[in-house]
Amino acid sequence: MKLQIFNTKLGLLAAKIYWKSWRHLGLSEDEIVSIALHAEHDSKKRYDPKYGLSFETYLKLNGANFIKSSYRSLMNKVDDWIGFKDMKTLEEQNTVSYTPENYLRSVEFREMVHLAFKKAKNEDERQVFALYVKGYKNLEIAKKLNLTTRRVRYLISIFKDHIKVLTKRYGY
């Protein structure tokens, strides 16, 4: 089911940012829209009317930054999980709240990442996931870790598939 976006300006902004900088990540239209909605929600918290701007103008001026930072924070959360923290710390950080902001911290997400990790044969192949979320391209990852590009593509596709399961489940 497609997400609906009611703020046309924000939708266009999200599309523009997607085509300029996120094409290589293979995000779906729904994922872009959900990042845009998250950014809009974020920007409402930071908006201060005392400066005389309407929220629409403020969003137009700062929307791109909010969308980028929302995506960056999403990827940082993923990177934190991939950073091989000890299990006790992961348990302490776990939350029961399945809001779009918190679902990445759920046990379910950790299990999905572990399923993807099981496909990796060694520590170098596990590093593929960490480099991918940091924005490295497939070829760069292959050269850096001395793996074939085919193997890198395979591991990344598995990782994306597991993330998409959660994305569909939580709508973010």
Curated annotation (Swiss-Prot):
Q: Which GO terms describe its molecular function?
A: DNA-binding transcription factor activity
Superkingdom of the source species = Bacteria
Q: Which GO terms describe its biological process?
A: DNA-templated transcription initiation
* InterPro entries, alphabetized: RNA_pol_sigma-70_dom, RNA_pol_sigma_r3/r4-like, WH-like_DNA-bd_sf
> Which NCBIfam families does the protein's record reference?
sigma70-ECF
Q: What is this protein called?
A: Uncharacterized protein MG428 homolog
